[in-house]
């Protein structure tokens, strides 16, 4: 739709009314990354282009929606037009690269991915990978019991095969960090940076994949295409049961949903923000109906995202069979609805939600079509807007089940100021209530006056700990031994003469290069018998 004009098209076709023709580019043969399924995205080869109606064709996708369509193109040499972009001609085994301005590629350390996995294990139990840095590859375990990955760092681990001109990949053949049919496994104290694909996947049903743990790890810049991934297409995926995801940090992600880790998940003490940038719909902590029983979601900081914070999902109305999730002591701010509670028999207590709400209620305890949450418990929460509707007021949509107005702070009915105004210093992560505030007096929210729990990793991720980019010239004074590729930052010692008595003394020199030149001393009187015509300094020796 463009103004008053509508341009209809169906699955397998896309109309770009202005962009393609203005570019003068024929996309036939390129790969389109197509977000045409709301929270699902696919890659497809473009099979034809009609410049008359600005449309291109591709093989149909499995779950096409009628709105919110976005795409970008890859896979043709003509698309390279910005420094840093590259294209691999798979047929001719040739790599094309446009370097940054002023950079000579022959003088740089340019590396390319040559293998998918740096480590693979099948039927190996109690294996430990420790203190290993993975660059442009990752690890994979299959049929493993009690395997551990710890204190390891992965740069460019998961990736796609689009650079090989392969579109629409089989989700089971993606080159991603994964565990298949493995239980009791642990990933801890590690970092995952820059992926084109999920950060990590655990495959297998409840009896094949259970009691797996991801803890105290850092995830950044995860999935810049969000395409061709399994299931709901999420950032962290587990298909099994009893997974634990705790004390982690995640930020800057593409997929609409972030953490979806199977039946009866435990998600605690995580800090997550800036998520779901490439797809519609979604939630940070996502639970479908069967996954909600015995789910335990607590002590998390979730903020600054246009997605739902924590969602017990499922269809609307009486068909929703999600039951028995416990969600407590979470702080959520600047999110598009902090809590979405669908189903029944849930326990939602001691949560704090405030800030930008993107026109949704902060805590939604959904009652729809005469069904929902009649037996749920909602107490000791603090939020500006709590109701049984996505946007409607508490007066029009009162919360069902066990809900007592005096045991919650709800800005719809309480007029003691916003939740944020009643917190000590939320900008600096002090979410305790101010003494004498309504939240303080009612003992509601995620923090009491003496609480000091903190979400996220117990270690601080710093670039200096993992200087993957840096100066790689051993002669430079800022040479970084751990750098994997050059960032053009090399600084060199100033060489020169460092003797103040020399005539070419350099006061800025840091390294003496042996170049000192000295004044010739001697008799400079031409009438003297020992006159030295080359003398530059008279030494008083004239006779």
Residue ranges and their predicted role:
Residues 246, 252, 259-261, 268, ...:
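Core solenoid repeat modules with strong leucine/isoleucine-rich periodicity
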Residues 302, 318-430:
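Predominantly extracellular beta-rich ligand-binding scaffolds that present long acidic/polar faces
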Residues 113-118, 135-136, 164-179, 194-206, ...:
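Extracellular beta-strand/beta-solenoid scaffold signature
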């Amino acid at each position: 739709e463009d103004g008053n004009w509508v341009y209809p098209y169906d699955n397998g076709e896309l109309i770009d009314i202005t962009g393609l023709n203005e570019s003068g580019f024929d996309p036939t043969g390129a790969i389109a990354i197509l977000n045409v399924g709301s929270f699902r995205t696919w890659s497809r080869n473009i099979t034809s282009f009609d410049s008359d109606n600005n449309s291109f064709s591709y093989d149909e996708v499995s779950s096409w929606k009628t709105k919110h369509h976005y795409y970008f193109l890859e896979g043709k040499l003509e698309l390279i037009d910005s420094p840093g972009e590259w294209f691999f001609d798979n047929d001719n085994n040739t790599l094309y690269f446009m370097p940054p301005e002023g950079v000579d590629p022959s003088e740089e350390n340019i590396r390319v991915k040559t293998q998918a996995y740096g480590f693979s294990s099948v039927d190996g139990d109690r294996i430990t990978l420790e203190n290993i840095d993975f660059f442009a590859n990752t690890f994979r375990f299959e049929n493993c019991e009690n395997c551990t990955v710890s204190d390891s760092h992965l740069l460019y681990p998961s990736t796609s095969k689009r650079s090989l001109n392969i579109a629409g990949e089989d989700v089971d053949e993606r080159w991603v960090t994964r565990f298949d049919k493995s239980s009791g496994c642990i990933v801890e104290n590690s970092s995952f940076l820059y992926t084109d694909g999920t950060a990590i996947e655990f495959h297998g049903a409840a009896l094949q994949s259970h009691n797996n743990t991801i803890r105290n790890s850092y995830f950044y810049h995860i999935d810049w295409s969000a395409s061709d991934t399994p299931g709901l297409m999420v950032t962290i995926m587990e298909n099994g049961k009893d997974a634990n995801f705790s004390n982690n940090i995640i930020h800057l992600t593409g997929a609409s949903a972030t953490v979806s880790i199977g039946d009866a998940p435990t998600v605690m003490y995580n800090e997550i923000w800036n998520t779901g940038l490439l797809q519609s719909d979604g939630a940070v902590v996502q639970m479908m109906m069967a996954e909600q029983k015995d789910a335990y979601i607590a002590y998390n900081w979730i903020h600054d995202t246009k997605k739902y914070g924590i969602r017990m999902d499922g269809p609307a109305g009486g068909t929703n069979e999600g039951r028995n999730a416990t969600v407590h002591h979470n702080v959520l701010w600047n999110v598009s609805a902090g809590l979405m509670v669908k189903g029944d028999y849930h326990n939602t207590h001691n949560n704090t939600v405030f800030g930008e709400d993107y026109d949704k209620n902060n805590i939604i305890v959904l009652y729809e079509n005469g069904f929902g949450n009649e037996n749920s418990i909602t107490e000791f929460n603090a939020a500006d807007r709590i109701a049984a509707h996505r946007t409607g007021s508490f007066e029009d949509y009162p919360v069902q089940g066990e809900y007592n107005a005096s045991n919650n702070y709800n800005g719809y009915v309480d007029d003691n100021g916003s939740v944020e105004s009643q917190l000590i210093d939320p900008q600096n992560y002090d979410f305790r209530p101010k003494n004498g505030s309504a939240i303080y007096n009612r003992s509601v929210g995620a923090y009491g006056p003496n609480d000091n729990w903190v979400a996220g990793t117990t270690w601080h991720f710093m670039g200096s700990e993992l200087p993957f980019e840096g100066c790689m010239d051993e002669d430079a004074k800022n040479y970084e031994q751990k750098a994997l590729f050059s960032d053009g930052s090399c600084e060199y010692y100033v060489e020169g003469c460092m003797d103040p008595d020399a005539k070419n003394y350099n006061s800025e020199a840091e390294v003496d290069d042996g170049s000192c030149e000295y004044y010739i001393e001697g008799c400079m009187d031409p009438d003297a018998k020992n006159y030295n015509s080359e003398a530059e300094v008279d030494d008083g020796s004239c006779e």
